[in-house]
Amino acid sequence: MAVSTSHFRSLCASRPLSRTAIVGHISCRSYATTEPSPSATSTSTTTTARRRTTFKDKLNAGPSFADFVGNGNTPLDPSEAYALKTALVGPAGRKKEMTRLPSWLKTPIPDSKNYQRLKKDLRGLNLHTVCEEARCPNISDCWGGSDKSAATATIMLMGDTCTRGCRFCSVKTSRTPAPLDPHEPENTAEAISRWGLGYVVLTSVDRDDLADGGARHFAETVMKIKQKAPSILVECLTGDYAGDLEMVKLVARSGLDVYAHNVETVEALTPQVRDRRANFQQSIRVLEAAKNAQPSLITKTSLMLGLGETDDQLWDALRQLRAANVDVVTFGQYMRPTKRHMAVHEYVTPDRFELWRQRALDMGFLYCASGPLVRSSYKAGEAFIENVLKKRRATSGGTETVGVRPVTVDEVTR
């Protein structure tokens, strides 16, 4: 009992302190009532006004709501429409001015059912695509269309690691990538026949660690696809096989419909843009060899703009490509994948892309796709079917067949 009494007294002794705290708390809460207490009134008179924010200052300095709704949709002139905007980025005291991505280069985030289905199939068969590895901005367009037969998939063969390190490309690099998957040709053909695509693009990483550069693996994949889906159109976007033209001929005779090899940029900028093992003249020889090996093939190449090239350099590149009998050329805007890669020298406007498209057609190219978001395989099926195959078949009265009988690797190498 003595212990409990002393404990009770200690609780009573602390009550005056707790009452003071409670009274103070109540007086603070009464600040919001219609009749504030004297202490609350004195506190409110000494409180300073909140500082105006930068956002509010900018908002008040801009047009009024009446101005916003009253001007209508006045069209912008080209200089206003293509004006680049900048922003200050970084911590206080170390901010840097960065050029914002132009509006004509912005694309939607992919989320369609077709996109999810293709991605699931690819992971299940352990296949890679350049669409994902190279962070292509058009993946929602190429994979997300409602019409499967018009969709385009770009399968990347021989793994996801390249032996070269071009300064514009985000694909992983290594001197010793993983060995080839012997089941990849069969898996690729199975996936493509399952999807019901009308057009497929096969590309690959460079494999300088292999004696043939992976050419036989490439050719075998084409043959498997043609066996499972004879009506599908196949485009092969290959490397230069270190200049081994016999390997180029092997792939060209494997049964494909389009042989593509990208020169990437003009000759003068090639040493700064591409890996040291690649050069412009070697790429020209690859395209010539493919055409000579199978004259019925469509040959195709692509150039990136915005790297610092001049008009004269572009003219020279196009002349050399036409001299090599290249049929199709595409122009697209270079977009820096990460801060480790080459910076963008210039954002080329859509009007300039249209100008170069007209120039290429005037020079005799069979077809030219040109635009900020155009990539070498962007909507390749649509462009090829509508602008190349149909044109050729109409000229020949519908009797021409593009492509050749698939053969074995042994037949090709004999």
From Swiss-Prot:
One Gene Ontology biological process: lipoate biosynthetic process
Which cofactor names does the annotation list? [4Fe-4S] cluster
Annotated organelle transit peptide span: 1-31
Has keyword Transferase?
A: yes
Pfam families cross-referenced by the UniProt entry: LIAS_N, Radical_SAM
Q: Entry cofactor note text?
A: Binds 2 [4Fe-4S] clusters per subunit. One cluster is coordinated with 3 cysteines and an exchangeable S-adenosyl-L-methionine.
- Give a yes or no for keyword NAD in this entry: no
Sorted alphabetically, which InterPro entries does this protein's record hold?
Answer: Aldolase_TIM, Elp3/MiaA/NifB-like_rSAM, LIAS_N, Lipoyl_synth, rSAM
> Which region ranges are annotated with the description Disordered?
31-51
Alphabetized UniProt keyword annotations: 4Fe-4S, Iron, Iron-sulfur, Metal-binding, Mitochondrion, S-adenosyl-L-methionine, Transferase, Transit peptide
Enumerate the residues binding [4Fe-4S] cluster 2. Answer: 162, 166, 169
Q: Which domain of life is it from?
A: Eukaryota
PANTHER family referenced in this protein's UniProt entry, alphabetically: LIPOYL SYNTHASE, LIPOYL SYNTHASE, MITOCHONDRIAL
Family, per entry: Belongs to the radical SAM superfamily. Lipoyl synthase family.
Question: What is the protein's given name?
Answer: Lipoyl synthase, mitochondrial
Source species of the chain:
Aspergillus fumigatus (strain ATCC MYA-4609 / CBS 101355 / FGSC A1100 / Af293) (Neosartorya fumigata)
